[in-house]
Design a protein with these regions (language model features):
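Conserved single-residue anchors adjacent to enzymatic active/cofactor-binding motifs
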Residues: 1-218
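Short, charged alpha-helical interaction segments and adjacent helix-coil junctions
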Residues: 70-76, 173, 180-281
């Protein structure tokens, strides 16, 4: 029987940094990146230096793999209009931080930016997006490839293998039907639950290690406070959005639009629009 587990973002902040729990994050990254990932160490990341608001809005963890790759995993709960730009900033910062002065550029580490978001980032119906940067010829339409020497020296097959790789998981777009092992992970990220039949790498360890009952008394208090902060933030956000919709609806009441049309434009129910109209008359 499956049971609710603690949220993945809180686990990233408090539990997944311990070596005994590396297997959970290794499993997730292995399923997403489609090759086995072994974590060598957890490095200092921006998410360790957050203000009070960010403690429950955003968390990240920076991983160094045994192949000397950097993997930045970030969870973002609330909407940010410039989130794409922040993804670029985060990766650019890593590029400059992890190359020593005077070192050749060829020593720059491969970087993976994995972004788990719980809001409507951009426009798209999918729930897992992968950025594939290629140099395409404007005239010949061919893809620029590395030379044989570059392939040998840098152990790459494509030029894009050198550049940072971006992934975005729009968790709320997932329909809860797990068709493969990556879907099983997305289901867990969305529902904090591992179903009994799930076989994805790392989820067996998540099911064992991320039980609320396994937390210390102090950690239980911290997690309960985290959950309460999230509920308050969600309530404030919902109220603000509802008020914004009402203001838009009020302005549309001055037009010839019907209640049904105003409801369609604002996301309010017809009953809510009718109530606004009767209040304004």
């Amino acid at each position: 029987m499956s049971r609710k587990l603690i949220r993945f973002d809180w686990a990233m902040k408090k539990l997944l940094r311990h070596k005994a729990n590396f297997g959970i994050l290794e499993g997730f990254l292995s399923e997403l990146l489609r090759f086995d990932v072994t974590i060598e160490s957890i490095l200092e990341s921006e998410g360790n230096k957050q203000d009070e608001y960010d403690k429950y809005n955003r968390v990240d963890i920076l991983v160094k793999s045994q192949n000397n790759e950097l993997m930045l995993v970030e969870v973002q709960n609330d909407s940010e209009i410039d989130y794409f730009q922040r993804m670029i900033f985060g990766v650019s910062k890593l590029v400059t931080e992890y190359i020593k002065e005077g070192e050749p550029y060829g020593t720059i580490k491969k970087i993976y930016s994995v972004n788990i978001v719980y809001f409507g980032l951009g426009q798209g119906k999918d729930y897992v997006y992968e950025y594939k940067g290629e140099f395409v010829g404007l005239h010949e339409k061919d893809i620029l490839l590395p030379t044989s020497l570059q392939k040998q020296d840098f152990k790459v097959e494509k030029v894009s293998d050198i550049f940072p790789k971006y992934y975005i998981l729009k968790v709320n777009n997932f329909n809860d039907v797990a068709k493969d092992t990556l879907d099983e992970w997305v289901y867990f990220l969305k529902n904090s639950e591992v179903k009994d039949g799930f076989k994805a790498k790392g989820l067996d360890k998540a099911k064992e290690k991320l039980r609320y009952e396994s937390l210390t008394a102090e950690d239980k208090k911290m997690y309960d406070r985290f959950q309460e902060n999230r509920r308050i933030e969600n309530s404030v956000s919902y109220t603000a959005k509802l008020e914004e919709k009402r203001e838009i609806a009020k302005s549309l009441l001055q037009t010839s639009l019907s209640n049904a049309e105003i409801a369609k434009h604002t996301g309010l129910t017809v009953e809510q629009v009718e109530q606004l109209r009767s209040t304004n008359e």
